Structures are given as C-alpha cells and as structure tokens.
Amino acid sequence: CYSNGRCYGAPASRKERKLTMIEKVNPSHPDKVADRIAGAIVDLAYKTEAAPKIAVEVLIGHGKCHVIIETTAAINPLDVEDAIHRIAGAVWADIDIVPQDKHLSDNQSAGIRCGDNGIFKGMPLTEEQKALSVIAHDIYTHYPYDGKYIIDEARLIICQSNASTAELSNMYPPAEVNPLGDWTGGTDVDTGATNRKLGSDMADSVTGGGLHGKDLSKADVTLNIYAFLKAQETGKQVQIACAIGDDIIDGHPYQELVDIAAEYISSVGGFEKFAEWGLF
C-alpha cells in the first residue's frame, strides 16, 4: 500500500495463490494512439449510417500515419485526416478508403449476423488488475504522455515518459520507476499499430481478436464485450465460439448482443473513448 491509501497486491508465494501478472498502457502509448485513431474513424462511420460495416487498420510513427479503411459508409477523407491530426498531431496522413467486399455485405443484407468466426473468453478481473488500472489512470492525470505499467505479484513497475523519476518514486514509493532513467516516448520514438495491446485492453480475457477499428457486427467487438461483461456479472469464466453468419450466440439473438455492446460503447463515450483504455 502507498501513502495515498492505494494498494496493488500483497506478497505471496506462487504456491499460495495463482500467479497474477498484468500490463496496462495509457492512451498516449503509440499502439493506443493507433487504436484511438481507428476508433475515431469508426465513430465517423456511425455518424453516416445506423449500422455501418467497417474495418480500420492504422500504422503510425515518425511523422507518418497510414490508414486503410474498408467500409460501407461514405466517410469523407478530410474528416479522417482531421481525426488523425487531432489525436496524433501534425503527421503526414496516408488514407486509403475501399468498399467492403460484396460477399461480406451480402452476408449482412438480411439483418445483423455474426460477422466472423472466432473464440472468445470473459474472465472476472482480479484485484491486482483493477488496482493497476486505477494506478495507470492516476499517473496519466499527472503525466498525459506515453507510459506502461506492470504488476507481477507484489512487484510494481512504472515506465512513464516525460516525467520525473524522483517525483513518481515519491508517489509510489515501493515501485520500480523508469529502471533505465528518465525517457521520452510517443510516436516519434516508437511506432504504433491497431490492436497490439490486447492484454492491456482485456486482461485475462484475451483470445483471438482485438477490439478496435471495427463495427459491432464484428464478433471481435461485440462478443468480447459481452463475454467480459458477463464474466464480471457472474464472477465466472465465460467461453463462446461462433461461426460467421451465426444469428444465435450463447442462447441469444446476435442482434441482442450487438445492442448490449452498443450500450456499453455509448456509456464510455464512443469507439474512440473505448480505445483509450479498453475494457478496464
């Protein structure tokens, strides 16, 4: 526990309890910058259509941002460029917008059905995972720059760019802070790509697909959200598998699960906001 009253875990042998490790990155990590841009573009699609189909890939780094968008929605490239600059600053934007594959479009023409094959798992969050999220949010309010944080049982590691190691050590005295010293980060130091921080987004619920840059017909979004929420509610592991085109999943119409996911996305402020921290 720290002087501010927050605790992240207690020492225990590996035999006494299940090994707990968790990583969390903040919204300014290059991979999360890519996720946020992808989320902002999905938000644009939902402004033009009630149920758009869209898949976005973003690669960003060293002054350049490459974006590929496959969609049914009529998205203005200038709006995409504005979103890139708002999130990532004055980078050169390479934007490619292509129509969705006709066969995939036909699959959804009679109504929303599962948009992909996949396996999904929801796991209840551990106390350490919840605590690390609190720590990450707390540090980010003081230092809104690229950072990564890890808990390995009783070990807390804080790597925070553009921050005083001494100040962070005072905030979290037992932590290992910036082991190699003060540093700068961001997309001029590292590159970022969509859906590379699955553990940070989903904790132990990681299976196959990522959460970002996709509409709600995509099982990677809707079923990951549904499985995660169900696991938190029941306190038990949730496992789901689906085939593309399925209209009943876990005993529910797929549209019902889409509605649950849509409500969750709305509650956090949209796809861009969802991309900042993921599911926890």
Kindly give the residue locations of the regions a language model identified.
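Short, Lys/Arg-enriched N-terminal segments with co-localized hydrophobic residues
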Residues: 1-20
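A domain-level signal for the structural core that forms small-molecule/cofactor-binding pockets
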Residues: 17-280
